[in-house]
Amino acid sequence: MENNEVIIMPRIGEKAPEFQANTTQGPINFPSDFSGKWKILFSHPADFTPVCTSEFMTFGKMAEDFEKLNCQLVGVSIDGLHSHIAWLRTIKEKIDWKGLKNIEIKFPLVDDISIVFLCLLSFLVSTHISE
């Protein structure tokens, strides 16, 4: 059976939906907690993966650059809070990648094990997730 459903993906500059979530930095109300700032809301597929780790380390290294631009990063993935915290601790304490080490990730990482926020943001499409 053919599915002709059209999925509208979020675009740069569009207003993001509001949500409340638990993060590695405590609870947030998005976007109101970051009022007056540019916001980059991004997702990654899984904690502890090599590519995601290198990307997070790069973001961590660039933290001051984002602050100078009045820009707040917020990450979201399907992993839980305990996994996020362990991964960020591993990045800070154990990973040395291309001369980057001791990188502390200071932006919040949303706990979305239920995939509610990823679907709300159209990062995942719930009709394509097997139950």
Regions found by a protein language model. Give the residues of each.
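Chalcogenol-based redox active-site neighborhoods
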Residues: 1-131
